[in-house]
Curated annotation (Swiss-Prot):
This is Helicase SWR1. Residues 1-244, 457-615, 628-801, 1594-1632, 1669-1691 are annotated as: Disordered. Residues 335-409 form the HSA domain. Residues 1375-1525 form the Helicase C-terminal domain. Its EC number is 3.6.4.12. Component of the SWR1 chromatin-remodeling complex. One of its GO terms (biological process) is chromatin remodeling. Pfam families: Helicase_C (PF00271), SNF2-rel_dom (PF00176). It comes from Gibberella zeae (strain ATCC MYA-4620 / CBS 123657 / FGSC 9075 / NRRL 31084 / PH-1).
Length: 1691
């Protein structure tokens, strides 16, 4: 029978720690097997070294009481050297970081760490030690064998086996047995069939020296012990010659996991019954099923209770008198010692202090003497050493020290010099980079301008976007994107026209698609040809035929296709070479007078290319083109091609601009094919009519500004010199445009010679400011044009787009133009912005566009219209009014309502247009994204001005075919918002195409934007103005902006007034007090954006009304429960009793004895006689006599010894007492009945005159005497002596005004001490009389009891703020009161806008106080109620005011019933205020509109107004002056169009004219004063120039807030920024070469004849060469550094 394994049977006494090592290894294997593997790799194999051996002949070489050596050898044999090093496997992620096994142990009462102490003590016997057969006789000296878990082993040199590193697969785990069997019998080791195969032992590696690290030596002892354990376990198996292969399997865990509840051993029962359980469970822990809890502590036994009782009794005994804890003996009862007052200083104290101070002075003097003596000694020593003769070594050391110090100084200086050189080189590199970046930005901007101009000209010529392919300058677009756009348009067209198989448009489209592949192959073939080959190929272009008007539109023939291809190829060449017929702004061309010969050759090639075609080739024949070009070349030199807008742009060749500076502006999808036929037809008709006009008529027509064609509006004005001839079409419109005829011959003569300046701007009004780049050359023309601004609109010409038959109503002329423009956008597959001013009918034009799509293109939808919540119903009503044929879905309501409306969402027949709000789009964005929309229209598109907002990002991802933005304010704050709108229209698809990048866009226009915001529009230099002009050209294809003053000449005028309001006294105190607070100053200086905004909002609240900042409190008095005087009540009563209590036996009451006759005058004689008659004197006398008899008969003798005598004596005393009472009553009754008056009350009242009540006769009680009483009453006497109620009424106003100071404290019991008891009774009686209810009848109004003191009493007890203080506390309300009274007297009605909702509440109180009728609209107003309120206000003239919120109530509401707009406060965004004022100044308004702005002077509101003016100025320059109108090019002649291409010096200006223009200014009126100022700067002193600049800035800063439009004449002295180009400032020394003083330069040459340079040049060259390939550190953007946590990614 095998014995159970134990520590005694397995290990010898000499190895007690081996069990611990084995246990750690087993636990490591349970945790994943990596610990054991790590042990075998790290300890047995020693990190790849030869296997370690053991020597059992020396079993006691390790001692437990000695510390092992650091480099101790644990094996007899030397491990081999050439064994490859094996890497330790990486720990798996599921393995715990904690150490396997205990990390500390306790030895002899001391805790030791197991990591640094390698010898562990002998652990306790293993409770779960595994048993093995043949475990006896383990103490053997035979060779051992180490068995691994995988069964693979090999013999060591001494007979042991080592695991093969090649086999690492773990064996399968043996099936687990039940817990019962596991506990009863030992576990037997099982081996698999795979492990029973014989394997030849691996030959041992060659011997090698050990190369292991010190780290493995720490675990050598554990390895030896592990080997000893294995040796003892396999001793019996090694008795034979051949040791069998035995595989030991170790379980993953010490216990079998439980997989079923039945495997859990049930806890044995404690006791047979509950009583038995209660008896036993007290000592058993809760964990084992008992009742003993560990936190309860030991059981409270009788002994413990007895001990505690003895302690308590002892304490009680000691507390008694005489005990240890008594009050007399215990120290705790002693009073705390009182602090003694400090002792007063005496003479002794002053003496001690003086002595201490003197001691300190003596010690300090002694220290100074010692230091001085030491210094003298050292000086003497140094002097003695100096006088001694020096040896050579000392001299050498001194010289060495001197040279070392000099070397350090030189090295430091040289190092600083090289650092300065490095800084200078980096500065130059940075400057070069900035110049290169500017060139790149300008080249990209020029490319964008060229693309926009090409698109405009292509649209104007009627070719739409067919002429603009990838070769027309859009090199930045990839071929894949173009093909994808073609496919997308083809699919869309196919979907729209599935049911129209016989339609001509669909036929054209299909034919276009079929020939697309052939055209692509042809284009690919043309790409490989040179210019000469292309000229030869397309030399003979057939002329366009003259089709008749009855000819139907047919499919394009291959001949037409070749013509189109030819035009495309020619347009490509012209675009690349900056042809004058295509480019209106050639910034990419040569700008230097010193152009190379290559530029001249390119220009000659361009002239020859013009013969081939271009955009003019589609309108004219080859002969006409050659004639026109020859005339232009004859008049214009070839070398005069300069850029007149950007003189500082360096020359960049077209090839470089195309390759290096590519810029992706917008993606140009192909147009719909069915439009091409109509456009070609219109083009042919235009050419036909043009050819029929005689040449003489053409010359005359060329000079007229108002002449235009009917169909395609092709203008051909020519100058009198016939130097230029080309078409002047409007690239703005794809359809026919409106022309304005001259109103008078004096204004626009028929033979007006062309000038070099731009055309005149629209009429200058309060809304439109003339652009400084496009103003007239003479002031007379501008005046005449301004005088005709109120004239009726001209008669419209024939429009290309007919009014859809679905539209109900008549469109105005400008609305027809807008419809043409929108239809042209759709035809070109271009998205746009309709930015007409508020009130011009953007809604109607949008509805007309959708109706046009349904009628012409048969596209009924689905369309998505996203509008603000306030105008949803307005849009629905407009659709039903103007286009009832559309099915409208108003998508709003609760979640259930919206879900019900989405039923049949994907069915196109249920509805055509979906109208919803921005909020609902964000809430249900997943539903909207799944639907494919044809047209997405955004009303009030400035809601998506922030590209970082969720609204912008959500709407950007919608699946739409076309997009249209409606906004009255395309530019509100900055150009970033404008970029957000443009990129939303033209997003990039898969990172390709789309509008320009935000950073690129900012680089283009950062300079003019900063100049406008900082210095105003008048301070812009020429470069900034040129950039603004190019911005206009970039925006013109996508933006249509008309003003009311431009399109509607009968619009009423609009006047703006700024009312400055003084702060009230309370406002000024709150305003100054808030600013003077310390925390406010710290917040404003901290730079925290949110905190600063919060402070500014508080200041704005004070300016609007002080109640928004601090409410006026309700003042009440503090009520005391008990007054101070009441504490002396008892004392007062006692004193009064002692001093005033009379003695009844000393004083005689004369009134009681009837000795005062006048005391009874209050009784009448009748009453006195009746009292005498009712006297009961006789009855009282009888009772007295009867009581006397009873008293005398009572027992009178007293015998104290008997009870009867005592009782009888007491009864006798009581009887005599009653007798005395009856006798006293008889006495009193006799005196009282004898009281009689001398005259009596009735006689006194009869004889009393009553002078105090004489003026008022009492009202007679007889009715017939009442009339006589009224007649005898005197009103004069009544007015002279008023009653109490009349007096109270007269003082009521004074009491209400001046009874405003409540007492600080009031009490309840003060009246009785002040008035006394009688006074309180008198007032109480009077109060009861006053509070008596007044009789009233049902038909009479109720009357309050007449209480004359009620008003004063209430006002002195509680103080409510006077409602009139609401107005007097605020300066704005005072001005508003006067303004409303003035408006009401004049019959005007007003809209009052404010930004804050709480201000609306105050305005309501204000209007209620004054009794004005008003309506209110804010964000809380429901959508259904907004239209009702709007209609009510417009139809009810009795309503004076309509108060609205700027943010909620000002959008999309038509309030033409009012003619006055009052802005109570300024919005941060001036565009919001402009939208609000346009709600009444719009089409339909018949009266002039006055706008009043209430601004608190000397406050933050003045600064807000100034900032708003700056933002409005930026909008005027970027948007208003751009003239984004349909008739923009109608006012331009050919000369104006090509003025940017002409060189000023090519017009015959010589050097004298240039010098004269330099001093007095040239023909350009915008720059004359700037040039004069520059010339004056050169003549004046530097100090005078600097002072003039400062003064001019101050003047312009003051004028910027009051002037509406810029003045043509600038100040006398101009600034360098204004007139001097970069690098030409006088203060910077940048003079011209002519004006600079001539200094003769002396050149030096070296021996080789080369020019000698300075050392600085050499150092700069060396450093530049070294830093040539290093990274240049660019300056950090300060704005980005402040964006903490914000998104700064590029979009």
């Amino acid at each position: 029978m095998p014995e159970t394994a134990s520590t005694a049977n397995v290990l010898p006494k000499s190895d007690p720690d081996a069990i611990k090592t084995e246990q750690d290894a087993l636990e490591g294997y349970e945790n994943g097997g990596d610990a054991l593997q790590g042990t075998m790799d790290g300890h047995v194999e020693t990190n790849g070294d030869a296997p370690a051996t053991e020597n059992h002949h020396e079993p006691n070489h390790i001692h437990d009481d000695e510390r092992p050596a650091k480099r101790r050898r644990t094996r007899d044999s030397t491990p081999p050297q050439n064994t490859p090093k094996k890497m330790k496997p990486v720990s798996p992620p599921w393995k715990k970081i904690s150490a396997d096994g205990p990390t500390s142990y306790t030895e002899n009462g001391r805790r030791k760490s197991g990591r640094i102490n390698t010898l562990l003590p002998e652990p306790s016997p293993l409770s779960k030690s595994r048993t093995s057969k043949r475990s006896t006789g383990a103490n053997s000296n035979t060779k051992t064998e180490i068995h691994l878990t995988n069964g693979n082993s090999r013999k060591m040199p001494n007979g042991s086996h080592k695991a093969s590193p090649a086999t690492k697969a773990p064996s399968k785990q043996a099936p687990a047995s039940t817990p019962k069997s596991a506990s009863k019998k030992p576990t037997e080791t099982r081996t698999s069939s795979r492990s029973t195969r014989r394997r030849s032992p691996t030959p041992p590696p060659p011997p090698k020296n050990s190369t292991r690290s010190r780290r493995s030596a720490r675990f050598s002892d554990a390895v030896i012990k592990d080997e000893a354990v294995q040796d003892s376990r396999t001793a019996t198996s090694n008795s034979t010659n051949r040791s069998p292969r035995i595989k030991l399997r170790v379980g993953r865990s010490g216990h079998i996991p439980l997989v079923h509840p039945g495997q859990v051993r049930k806890r044995p029962k404690i006791g047979t019954s509950f009583e038995d359980f209660w008896t036993r469970a007290g000592d058993i822990p809760v964990e084992e099923g008992g009742l003993q809890a560990s936190e309860d502590g030991p059981q409270y036994t009788d002994e413990l209770a007895e001990r505690d009782a003895r302690v308590i009794l002892r304490v009680e005994k000691e507390v008694e008198d005489g005990g240890m804890l008594s009050q007399g003996r215990c120290s705790i009862f002693l009073p705390e010692p009182a602090e003694e007052p400090p002792r007063q200083w005496a003479r002794q104290d002053h003496m001690v202090k003086a002595m201490t101070n003197f001691r300190k002075l003596m010690l300090a003097e002694q220290q100074r003497h010692r230091i001085a003596a030491k210094k003298v000694a050292e000086a003497c020593r140094d002097e003695w050493l100096r006088r001694q003769p020096k040896s050579e070594e000392e001299i050498e050391a001194e010289q060495r020290a001197v040279w070392i110090s000099r070397y350090r100084i030189v090295a430091k200086t040289l190092f600083g010099t090289w650092e300065n050189v490095r800084t200078e080189v980096n500065r130059r590199r940075l400057a070069e980079w900035e110049q290169e970046e500017q060139r790149r930005v300008k080249a990209a901007l020029n490319e964008a301008v060229n693309l926009s101009e090409q698109k405009l000209q292509a649209r104007q010529a009627g070719l739409d976007s067919e002429q603009l392919s990838e070769e027309d300058g859009f090199d930045d677009l990839s071929d894949d994107m173009s093909m994808a756009d073609d496919d997308e348009l083809g699919l869309a067209s196919g979907e729209d026209e599935d049911d129209e198989d016989g339609d001509a448009d669909s036929d054209i489209m299909s034919s276009d698609e079929e020939e697309g592949d052939e055209e692509d192959q042809k284009d690919i073939g043309d790409e490989n040809l040179t210019q000469e080959q292309l000229r030869a190929k397309y030399a003979h272009i057939p002329e366009l035929e003259k089709p008749s008007t009855e000819t139907p539109v047919t499919e394009p023939t291959p001949k037409d296709t070749d013509a189109v291809d030819t035009a495309q190829a020619t347009a490509t060449e012209n675009a690349e070479t900056s042809d004058e017929s295509v480019d209106m702004d050639d910034d990419m061309g040569s700008t230097d007078m010193d152009s190379d010969e290559e530029d001249e050759e390119e220009e000659s090639e361009e002239e020859s290319d013009e013969d081939a075609g271009g955009l003019l080739g589609l309108l004219f024949g080859k002969s006409e083109l050659k004639k026109m070009n020859s005339e232009a070349v004859a008049e214009t030199p070839a070398d005069s091609k300069e850029d007149s807008e950007m003189p500082d742009v360096e020359a960049v060749s077209d090839g470089e601009g195309a390759e290096e500076n590519e810029m992706s502006l917008i993606q140009m999808p192909d147009p719909e094919p069915h439009e091409s036929g109509a456009l070609e037809k219109s083009t042919k008709e235009a050419v036909e009519e043009k050819e029929q006009i005689p040449a003489a008529m053409q010359d005359v027509a060329a000079g007229q500004d108002g002449l235009s064609n009917t169909d395609n509006n092709v203008q051909e004005p020519a100058s009198q010199d016939n130097d230029v001839a080309m078409t002047g079409n409007d690239p703005e419109e794809p359809s026919a445009l409106t022309f304005e005829k001259p109103h008078s011959p004096a204004t626009e003569p028929a033979t007006n010679p062309p000038s070099r300046v731009h055309s005149t701007s629209p009429p200058a009004t309060s809304e439109t400011k003339p652009s400084e780049l496009d103003t007239a050359s003479t002031e007379e023309m501008a005046v005449d044009k301004h005088d005709t601004s109120r004239s009726p609109s001209p008669q419209p010409s024939n429009h290309k787009i007919e009014v859809p038959f679905l539209l109900r109503g008549t469109l105005r002329e400008y609305q027809r133009d807008g419809l043409d423009w929108l239809a042209g956008l759709y035809a070109n597959s271009t998205n746009g912005i309709l930015a007409d001013e508020m009130g011009l009918g953007k809604t109607i034009q949008t509805i007309a566009l959708l109706a046009h799509l349904a009628c012409t293109h048969e596209v009924w939808g689905p369309h998505l219209v996203i509008v603000p919540t306030s105008v949803m119903l307005n849009w629905e009503m407009e659709f039903k009014k103007w286009c009832p044929g559309f099915k409208i879905l108003a998508y709003y309501g609760s979640q259930e309502e919206r879900k019900r409306k989405r039923q049949g969402w994907n069915n196109d027949d249920i509805w055509n247009v979906c109208i919803t709000s921005y909020q609902l789009v964000l809430q249900d964005q997943q539903v909207f994204k799944r639907r494919r929309w044809h047209y997405m229209i955004l009303d009030e598109a400035h809601n998506i001005k922030n590209f970082k907002s969720q609204r912008w990002q959500t709407l950007l991802g919608f699946n739409t075919q076309a997009r249209l933005l409606l906004t009255g304010t395309p530019l509100q704050n900055n150009l970033t918002e404008l970029w957000s709108l443009l990129f939303f229209l033209m997003p990039a698809e898969n990172g390709v195409g789309g509008f320009a990048d935000l950073q690129e866009f900012h680089d283009w226009f950062a300079k003019p934007e900063s100049q406008i915001l900082e210095s105003g529009r008048e301070q812009m230099d020429d470069e900034a103005r040129a950039i603004i002009s190019k911005l206009h050209k970039v925006l013109r294809p996508y933006l249509l902006r008309r003003l009311k003053a431009d399109v509607e000449k009968q619009m009423p005028a609009k006047y703006e007034h700024v009312e400055f309001c003084r702060l009230s006294k309370r406002q000024r105190e709150l305003y100054d007090g808030f600013l003077s607070r310390t925390d406010t100053k710290e917040t404003l200086n901290s730079g925290n954006y949110l905190s600063i905004i919060n402070c500014l909002m508080q200041l704005r609240k004070v300016c609007n009304h002080p109640d928004l900042f601090v409410d006026r409190p309700i003042m009440t008095s503090f009520r005391m429960q008990k007054s101070v005087v009441s504490d002396f009540e008892v004392t007062e009563q006692r004193v009064q009793r002692l001093l005033h209590d009379p003695s009844p036996m000393k004083d005689v009451s004369l009134g009681f004895l009837n000795l005062m006759p006048t005391q009874c005058e209050s009784l009448s004689t009748t009453q006195a006689e009746r009292i005498s008659q009712l006297s009961s004197h006789r009855k009282l006398m009888e009772l007295r006599e009867a009581q006397k008899i009873r008293a005398q008969s009572a027992h009178a003798n007293l015998d104290p010894s008997t009870v009867a005598s005592n009782i009888g004596y007491l009864e006798s005393g009581a009887r005599w007492g009653r007798y005395e009472e009856l006798q006293h009553c008889v006495y009193l009754n006799a005196l009282r009945r004898q009281k009689k008056p001398i005259y009596g009350k009735n006689l006194i009242e009869l004889l009393t005159i009553g002078t105090d009540k004489r003026p008022y006769k009492p009202r007679p009680k007889i009715p017939r005497q009442v009339l006589a009483w009224f007649e005898e009453e005197s009103t004069l006497v009544q007015s002279m002596i008023p009653t109490v109620n009349q007096r109270a009424d007269s003082f009521k106003t004074i009491i209400e005004k001046f009874s405003c100071v409540t007492p600080a404290v009031v009490t309840r019991d003060m009246e009785q001490f002040v008035l006394g008891r009688k006074g309180i009774e008198a007032f109480s009686d009077e109060d009861l009389k006053l509070s008596a209810p007044v009789r009233w009848a049902p038909f009479l109004p109720k009357e309050a009891p007449p209480d004359p003191w009620h008003e004063g009493r209430m006002r002195l007890s509680i103080q409510f703020p006077d409602k009139r203080l609401l107005q007097y506390d605020c300066g704005k309300l005072q001005i508003l009161d006067k303004l409303l009274r003035k408006l009401q007297a004049g019959g005007h009605r007003a809209l009052i806008f404010t930004q804050m909702t709480k201000v609306l509440d105050i305005l309501e109180q204000f209007l209620n106080i004054h009794g004005h009728k008003y309506l209110r609209l804010d964000g809380a107003t429901k959508v259904e109620q907004r239209q009702i309120l709007t209609d009510r206000f417009n139809n009810d003239p009795r309503i004076l005011c309509f108060i609205l919120s700027t943010r909620s109530g000002g959008l999309g509401i038509n309030l033409t019933g009012a003619d006055t707009v009052i802005f109570y406060d300024q919005d941060w965004n001036p565009a919001m205020d402009k939208q609000c004022q346009d709600r009444c100044h719009r089409i339909g308004q018949t009266r002039d509109v006055h706008i009043y702005r209430l601004v608190s002077e000397h406050t933050i509101e003045a600064n807000i107004l100034r900032k708003a003016s700056q933002k409005q100025m930026l909008d005027d320059v970027v948007i208003q002056e751009g003239e984004f109108t349909t008739d923009y090019f109608n006012k331009l002649s050919v000369r104006d169009v090509l003025s940017e291409k002409l060189d000023s010096k090519s017009e015959g200006l010589d050097a004298a004219d240039a010098a004269l223009d330099r001093v007095l200014g040239g023909p350009d009126t915008n720059n004359d004063q700037r040039r004069v100022g520059r010339a004056l700067e050169q003549a004046e002193d530097r100090e005078d120039v600097a002072a003039a600049r400062v003064a001019e800035k101050e003047i312009q800063a003051d004028d910027a807030d009051f002037t509406e439009k810029p003045s043509n004449n600038a100040s006398g002295t101009s600034t360098a920024r204004q007139g001097t180009p970069a690098g030409k400032s006088v203060l910077d020394g940048g003079l011209d070469d002519i004006d600079a003083p001539h200094v003769e330069e002396v050149l030096e040459y070296n021996a080789w004849g080369d020019k000698m340079h300075t050392i600085d040049d050499y150092m700069l060259g060396i450093m530049a060469e070294q830093l040539k390939d290093t990274k240049l550190e660019l300056p950090k953007d300060k704005k980005k550094g402040k964006k903490k946590g914000k998104d700064t990614r590029k979009r």
